[in-house]
Each structure stands twice: as C-alpha cells, then as structure tokens.
Amino acid sequence: MQLSNYHSHCTFCDGRSIPEDFVRFAITHGFRAYGFSSHSPLPFETFWNMSKDDMPEYLQEINRLKQKYSDQLEIYAGLEIDYLDETYNASIPYFQELPLDYRIGSIHFLPVSERLVEENMVCIDGSFREYAHSVERHFEGDVRLLVKRFFDTTMKMIEAGGIDIVGHMDKIYMNGQKYEIFNFEEDWYRKPFEAFLDLVPEKGLMVEVNTKNWTKKKELYPRVEYLSRMREMNIPVMVNSDCHYPDLVNDGRKEAFKLLKQAGFKSTRELVKGKWQDIAL
C-alpha cells in the first residue's frame, strides 16, 4: 500500500496543527510522500481559507520542511483552490504564478450573484441546517436544482483548467442525500454526474478518493459505487485523507485501497521526486 497524502490542512487555514506536526506523524507511520494543500485565498474572508498575506509564509514554511526532512519524506507544496466563477479560479494568474507542486480544484461555494462576497455564497460543505436553508432560499426548496448548479459549476471548473487534481468530486451528496427525493439513479443526478465524469479524462486530470468521512459515515468522495466506472475510463486516482488533525492523516486509507482493488484498479497516481507516476497497489 502506497503511503502518501496530498490533501491536508494545517494552521495556515482551518487545520488544527502546525505543518511540522503532520510531517512528524507521516514519518513515524512510514509515509513516503506528504503534500500540504491549504484552502486558497478567496476574494472574501472565511474562517477556513488562507489569506493572501499569509501565502509567502506558507510557502516558506513548506520549503523549510522539505529541506529539513529531505532524507526521510518527500514533502510537497500544494493548494486546494476554489472555483467561484470565470474570474476567480485556479487558472487565474495569481494561482498559476505561485511556485506550487500541484493544485487541487474543489467546489465549496456556489455564487448566487455576480458579486463575490460571502453573503452571496451557498456553502455545500457545511452543516445540513445551512445547506437546507440555502436550498429553500436560493433553489425554490428543490435540492435537485442545487445539484444541477453544483455539477454545472464543476464542469466549468474543469473547462477553466489550471488544476491537476479534482477534489471531493461529488461532495454535494454529503448533505443532499438527507432529502427524501434524493436518488443517485435518477436522471437529474446521474446524467450531469456522468457528463462531468466523461470530461475528467478528456482534460487529463487526476481524481482523489477522499476518505475524510469514511470513519464517521463510511462515505467516500467519489461514492464507492463509481469506482468501477472510473477504472473502466482509465481515470488516474490517489487516496487522500483531507485531514485537519495529524492523527487523521491515515484515516480510511487501508479501506479505500481495498475498495480500489475490488473495483479493478492496479495503481494509484503518486508524486515521486516531483514527477507524477503510476505506482502499483
């Protein structure tokens, strides 16, 4: 089993420990590679995103750790970058000019107005109460409309480019599945998801298998049921824990690798000495 993790949050965003604590855990548990992917700056403040002012220090600290632990662990500097709209996403010069090893593209917010401020954002990754309030207020009480907006926006993110990895690709279902009407097999969910999935290999992207909620909810993003389809499409994958605490770095990894093997995967995509390679499971 390949011990690596490329989706990780530290105290530069909403993580609960300093970067070095994650590095020490990774080394102690035999990891070969470890990547940091703090939540990128946004055009508005949130409690979980890094500020632009902190970016130089973030990059400096990750580079310091790279040098300090170079004989024990491959350490990489990444970002998890939100797609908001065509004016603010991973493809804009600010993010492309940063000296990063990789970029994860994710959807946490869906704008409901052209003005990119927090009050105009629907957060899909928070509490169900907040999610349900947004469905009522902005989507006529119909979760299907929110799902459509999510996948439409995800398609735009992929078309915009500037990313290497698609993060928690279907996390819209985390809260959405609590609605009685929610059905993964009906066309309103299945068709936009499959259209999005078809676009991933066309753009040459990797997809993470996100294990953040495996221990608590037995959920992966993408859903376990989609892994076989992704294998048939030759979509390269990696297993990431999306951890915010050092002791959760390895959460769900063993189970995810078992599920990947059952789905027919023979390898995962990994950074080896700075280059993406397929490593046998």
Predicted regions and their residues:
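Conserved residues at the C-terminal ends of beta-strands
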Residues: 37, 106, 169, 210, ...
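Hydrophobic residues within beta-strands of alpha/beta enzymes
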Residues: 34-36, 103, 166, 207, ...
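A generic hydrophobic-segment detector
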Residues: 9, 131-141, 275-281
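C-terminal functional module detector
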Residues: 152-155, 160-161, 225, 257-263, ...
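Active-site-adjacent C-terminal substructures of enzyme catalytic domains
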Residues: 187-249
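Extended substrate/RNA-proximal surfaces in nucleic-acid metabolism proteins
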Residues: 55-202
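An N-terminally biased module of ancient metal coordination in phosphate/nucleic-acid-related enzymes
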Residues: 1-85, 89-97, 101, 173-187, ...
